[in-house]
Amino acid sequence: MKDTAETAAFEIKDLEITLGGKRILKGITLDILNGNNYCLVGPNGSGKSTMLNILTQHLAKYGGTVLYAGKDLKKYSKKELAQTLAYVPQFDAGAFDFTVYEYVMLGRNPHKGLFDKDTEEDDRIVSHILQKTNLADLENRSILTLSGGEKQRAILARALVQEPDVLILDEPSNHLDITNQIKLMNLIVSQQITTVTALHDLNLASQFFGKLIVLKEGRIYAHGNTADIINPHMIRDVYHLNSEIEFNRKTGHIDISFYNQEDI
């Protein structure tokens, strides 16, 4: 896939889906442009995870059209899609006792035949990503013994060795302390590929992501440049909270403080 800001990774038109008798997404129309870091935000139940599950083929029965690299998403095989798109889910069981190296190497599977062995090129790619994610010293450790932050980096590393054009992540900072949240966000946005990350934290969204998509009750409330969207009116309308927003000269980003409506 050509990675330029002038082309769309995803072209979404009139996307809707009903699950368990409830309409979750309602008429989503949106282009996700290559070369940008997008953050998908919205309250619980607004449809964030559902939208990501559609973009990653985990949900296939939907209305409307989704084009990926100009081709109907439904026409991709799982393997073909995984050769250019990687997904970091909200929950990863990690129940098998792989070493970190073995676990990350699983990300090379979309580029192999069923019985192909790991190649020198596979080893080079995995070793490079282990270095990049600060996991090289842990490559012989069991994945089951890692801390939350280490395991999240391993999950990201497994996605990165796919060498994707597009990386999709569902709340990757959940259960991480502040230090590991910042490290992980820096890793995500430094990849120089298209990323779409669902988050709850608007401060992280404003600090790391240039593009914002806001969902409210299954519809797009706003999308565009993050700095143009995050404001007290949006926060009050979408989250039912009052807020104060200040520009932080040290970070070059805004800081958001929240207040309950009834407390003001």
Map each language-model feature to its residues.
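Conserved ABC ATPase signature
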Residues: D116-K117, S142-L146, E150
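The feature captures the beta-strand-to-loop junction immediately N-terminal to the Walker
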Residues: V41-P43
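Catalytic Walker B motif of ABC-type/P-loop ATPase nucleotide-binding domains
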Residues: L167-E171
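Conserved structural motif at the start of ABC-family nucleotide-binding domains
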Residues: F10-I12, L25-G27
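Conserved ABC transporter NBD signature motif
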Residues: G64-D72, L81
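ABC ATPase nucleotide-binding domains
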Residues: V238-I264
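Helix-to-loop junction immediately C-terminal to a conserved catalytic motif
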Residues: T56
